[in-house]
A protein has these predicted regions:
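A short, glycine/Asx- and small/polar-enriched loop/turn
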Residues: 32-36, 156-159, 203-206
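Acidic beta-strand-loop-alpha-helix segment within the catalytic core
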Residues: 60-152, 200-220
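Alpha-to-beta junction loops
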Residues: 157-162, 185-187
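Catalytic beta-strand/loop signature of glycosyltransferases that borders the donor
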Residues: 166, 189-193
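Acidic donor-binding loop at a coil-to-helix junction in glycosyltransferase catalytic cores
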Residues: 172
Length: 220
């Protein structure tokens, strides 16, 4: 975590010296407040990494007035790279991931969900009875488990329709994946009142949330 954080932070500070940088690994950064900032999780899915599973990610996001406008989610063990373009749309890049050569870009678009046969993705390491009870309110045709912010990317690629999270997360866990999801036409709302999730909150804690493709009939 710390080695990756040092490398990423140095690069971001050099490229964007005027932007506030919030990173999970630098506790001193958590006291900062700004309407526009960068937010980083250098290793999302620590349990997956320690257990040598492939679904851990690097998350980098740019947030403006509470909205994650740009995001990068990189899953190095899976050779998958997702990010938003300047126009706000999201893509998955494939290829050699060369610094100087952009690979093939595949535009991302969420699914058109069938509420009689939904595809649900949930946390691999933090799934609990409350989550299962909530998922039970839907007609589920397929259930996936995944770690880290890859769950947002599965929604963004159209591989899943719904991702509920009834557990603690921090803004650096979700901002990049949220940006990628929004850029693919998806939504992320609070669990309690279905209002849009915002960023830059005191303490950097997220409420419970639901990420989904428009058309999913959300349950209470």
């Amino acid at each position: 975590d710390e080695a990756a954080d040092a490398l990423i932070s140095a690069g971001l500070r050099a490229a964007f010296p005027d932007l506030v940088l919030i990173t999970e690994e630098q506790a001193a950064s958590h006291a900062q407040r700004a309407s526009t900032f960068l937010i980083v999780d250098p290793l999302d899915g620590t349990k997956e990494f320690v257990q040598r599973r492939g679904d851990f990610t690097v998350n980098i996001a740019y947030v403006e007035h509470g909205v994650p406008l740009r995001g990068v989610v990189y899953a190095p063990a899976q050779d998958r790279l997702f990010y938003t373009l300047p126009d706000g749309t999201s893509v998955e890049e494939t290829g050699a991931f060369d610094h100087d050569i952009v690979g093939t870009l595949h535009p991302l678009s969420v699914s058109k969900p069938d509420n009689t046969a939904l595809r649900v993705v949930a946390s691999k390491s933090h799934r609990d009875a409350a989550t299962d009870d909530y998922i039970g309110k839907y007609a589920v045709a397929d259930m996936k488990s995944a770690g880290s912010s890859l769950k947002f990317c599965l929604l963004a690629t159209g591989e899943a329709d719904l991702y509920p999270r009834l557990g603690r997360t921090m803004e650096w866990d979700t901002a990049a994946g949220d940006a990628v999801l929004r850029g693919a036409g998806g939504c992320m709302v609070r669990f309690d009142d279905h209002s849009v999730l915002t960023y830059g909150k005191d303490g950097w804690d997220n409420p419970f949330f639901i990420a989904y493709a428009p058309g999913v009939q959300l349950q209470k």
